[in-house]
Amino acid sequence: MAPRRRGVNQEQTVLDTGKLPGMVAAKKEMPMPRHAVLRWMVLTALFVAIAPAARAADPTTPAAAGLVDVTKVAPDIKLDIRYATPNNFTHVAVYPAARCFLRTDVANRLAKVQADLKKQGLGLKVFDCYRPFAIQQKFWSLVPNEDWVAKPVAKDGKPVIGSKHNRGAAVDLTLVDASGKDIPMPSGFDDFTEKARRDYTGGDPTARANAKRLEAAMVKEGFEPLPSEWWHFDGPGWQGYELLNVPFN
């Protein structure tokens, strides 16, 4: 018997039925009703809308985290970043560099304070600004006392409790005269006695008046004074800034 040739009729059968001869043709699928198609489209759109967005990568630079170098905004603000030197309550240099980074809004407000004080023959000198969370942890390892250091807490490797400095929304500073010399204050920086408190009534009246003058200048631009430290001020809306662990150098 001669082998069966694959002729025109066989190819036509395949084109017409989608099956080779001898095969049972599959049952033709019915088209999806229009209302079912619309329902599927709506459900798909809702799923896409409510699906959680992919978590963005953590920032690795101050700029990516929304921090600005204060000296770029107000170059005439003096820096005395104590934690970049041993001249602080830990007696250890814990910062790799003497830099001052703050949230953009906070930095701009500080620049306005500086401009206003300059008209009065005064200026600002900054002791501390943004503090990476890892440094806060180092502070705690050196001085585990909540009266002096905000206890840092992390969950799944992410900071959940820390200092307002970790948010880039707090600044420690003092006043200087036109020559850059410190103006007398009730106590030194990082003094954890009652002299540091804003309600302290002892000591030199002129020093207390200077602290009040600094407070008035900062409050004018929206800063919130910390009652226990005459040098510490929080930027408005600090609660809306996340805790950061972005290094700087």
Model-predicted regions and their roles:
Residues M1-V8, Q12, D16:
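Ser/Thr/Pro/Gly-rich low-complexity, intrinsically disordered segments
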Residues V14-D16, R39, P236:
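Alpha-helical and His/Cys-centered functional microenvironments
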Residues D16-K19, M23, K28:
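Short, positively charged and aromatic/hydrophobic N-terminal segments
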Residues M30-V42:
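Bacterial N-terminal signal peptides that target proteins for export
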Residues M32, W230-G235:
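Short linear loop/turn motifs
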Residues W40-A51:
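Bacterial N-terminal signal peptides
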Residues R55-C129, S141-S228, P236-N249:
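Extracytoplasmic cell-surface/polysaccharide-interacting catalytic and binding patches
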